[in-house]
Regions:
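Cytosolic catalytic domains that perform sulfur/thiol-centered chemistry
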Residues: 1-255
Length: 255
């Protein structure tokens, strides 16, 4: 089994790790830094090269976690699925749940210096989408676009953390802050509660598109939707970091 630490931001390279964890560096090599939006998915060839360098084989089982709980680990899980790899699971509650259970940790950041793996990227079209696909979904009565940002950012009453972005949301998008899918102890809520949270906004619509600030917490919604039994889901890779740039793409301010 391969265990990945997918922590980002202040938690990246933290002081403790699950024993044997390897770095899934979303702030580093596992994002395309030539793209205008942060955390953009790298090319299939680049992703494959990094995963091989981390010793992952096509037959391995993978578990991803992060030090914040349920946060960036969902992005790592979704990226692996986008690249055709399904033998991957998210550690519920992440490192906080692991340590709360009294399980062992090692000091220092996640590292890997072992042999290369044989991972093969097999990209799946449709799981990760661009702005044009989201615009089409907003006009499709059979689809719904859900925004994982806070209610204040969605309404435009709180500033965006990334300079230069407009406040507000896409016309027709609905707000489901990702934290509302997380229950006591930092664990994902039960499947029935997750389904109810999605149905409260989507109704009978089964085709769900997810957005957030930079494509990370949108994947928490994707994880929740998968646990709730939804099969037609997609993540907007650029998310608000792209849509919110000064452009002619429409923005709504307010609830």
């Amino acid at each position: 089994m391969v265990v990945f630490d997918a922590s980002v931001g202040a938690h990246r390279g933290g002081p403790q790790r699950i024993p044997g964890a390897r770095p899934f560096d979303l702030d580093g090599r596992l994002s395309d830094h030539d793209a205008p939006a942060p955390h953009t998915m790298p090319t299939a060839a680049a992703f494959e090269e990094v995963l091989r360098g981390l010793g992952v084989g096509d037959g391995d089982a993978v578990v991803v976690y992060d030090a914040a709980g349920i946060y960036s680990s969902a992005r790592a899980w979704w990226m692996l699925r986008v690249m055709g790899f399904d033998r991957v699971a998210v550690l519920d509650g992440g490192l906080p749940a692991w340590t709360a259970a009294g399980l062992p940790v090692e000091d220092g950041p996640a590292v890997y210096d072992g042999p290369r793996g044989t991972f093969t990227a097999r990209p799946r079209p449709g799981l990760l989408v661009d702005a044009d696909a989201v615009a089409a979904a907003l006009a499709d009565p059979a689809a719904v676009v859900l925004d994982a940002r806070t209610r204040e950012r969605f309404a435009g009453s709180a500033p965006e953390p990334r300079p230069g972005l407009r406040g507000g949301h896409m016309p027709g998008a609905l707000n489901l802050p990702f934290g509302e899918l997380v229950g006591p102890g930092g664990l994902m809520r039960p499947a029935g509660e997750l389904r109810a949270a999605f149905e409260a906004l989507a109704g009978e619509r089964e085709r769900l598109y997810f957005s957030c600030g930079s494509g990370v917490t949108a994947c928490v919604l994707a994880l929740g939707a998968t646990l709730a039994g939804y099969g037609e889901t997609a993540v907007y890779d650029g998310s608000w970091s792209e849509w919110g740039m000064p452009s002619d793409r429409p923005v709504v301010v307010g609830g």
